């Protein structure tokens, strides 16, 4: 008759918890979380938003079965100099953004911090241009300041 694999009893909780923790290190998601690998890899370095300078406007083709050119901008982040692609929301939103404008970007909201919908490789979206909300510019509530 083989021995028991796990202790049982009133005072076995600590031992059970430690044993479970040992096995959790073999799970990919747990290891990434505990070692902070996502934060090390993330261009925003774990922050919810980041400021950057627009380098150029680019059109990204939508994935199948859709057919469109999604308007995006290449942004160089101020905090670390990394260059990322950010989606510009709203109909004609790209017209409010010029090269060398200062923009604030945030995550686009895809699953697990990845890209969303039919825009391949784009994980961020523009929310502010030169200190003014892109939505306010689009709705005509505010004017873009001249820099």
UniProtKB/Swiss-Prot annotation:
MF (Gene Ontology): rRNA binding; structural constituent of ribosome
Superkingdom as given in the UniProt entry: Archaea
InterPro entries per record: NA-bd_OB-fold, Ribosomal_uS12, Ribosomal_uS12_arc, Ribosomal_uS12_euk/arc
Entry's family note: Belongs to the universal ribosomal protein uS12 family.
SUPFAM superfamilies reported for this sequence: Nucleic acid-binding proteins
Organism this protein belongs to: Staphylothermus marinus (strain ATCC 43588 / DSM 3639 / JCM 9404 / F1)
Keyword entries, A-Z: Ribonucleoprotein, Ribosomal protein, RNA-binding, rRNA-binding
Record-linked PANTHER family: 30S RIBOSOMAL PROTEIN S12 FAMILY MEMBER
One Pfam family recorded for the sequence: Ribosom_S12_S23
Source lineage: Archaea, Thermoproteota, Thermoprotei, Desulfurococcales, Desulfurococcaceae
Main function: With S4 and S5 plays an important role in translational accuracy. Located at the interface of the 30S and 50S subunits.
Annotated protein name in UniProt: Small ribosomal subunit protein uS12
GO biological process, one term: translation
Quaternary structure and partners: Part of the 30S ribosomal subunit.
Classification via NCBIfam families: PRK04211.1, uS12_E_A
Cellular component, GO annotation: small ribosomal subunit
Gene3D superfamilies in the record: Nucleic acid-binding proteins
Gene (UniProt): rps12
């Amino acid at each position: 008759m083989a021995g028991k694999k796990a202790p049982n009893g009133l005072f076995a909780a600590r031992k059970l918890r430690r044993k479970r923790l040992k096995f959790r290190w073999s799970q990919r998601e747990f290891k990434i979380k505990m070692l902070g690998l996502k934060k090390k890899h993330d261009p925003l370095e774990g922050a919810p938003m980041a400021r950057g300078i627009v380098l150029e406007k680019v059109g990204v083709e939508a994935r199948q079965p859709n057919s469109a050119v999604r308007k995006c901008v290449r942004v160089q982040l101020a905090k670390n100099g990394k260059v990322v692609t950010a989606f510009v929301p709203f109909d004609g939103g790209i017209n409010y953004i010029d090269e060398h404008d200062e923009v604030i970007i945030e995550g686009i909201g895809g699953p697990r911090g990845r890209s969303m919908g039919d825009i391949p490789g784009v994980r961020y979206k523009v929310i502010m241009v030169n200190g003014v909300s892109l939505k306010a510019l689009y709705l005509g509530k505010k004017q873009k300041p001249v820099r």
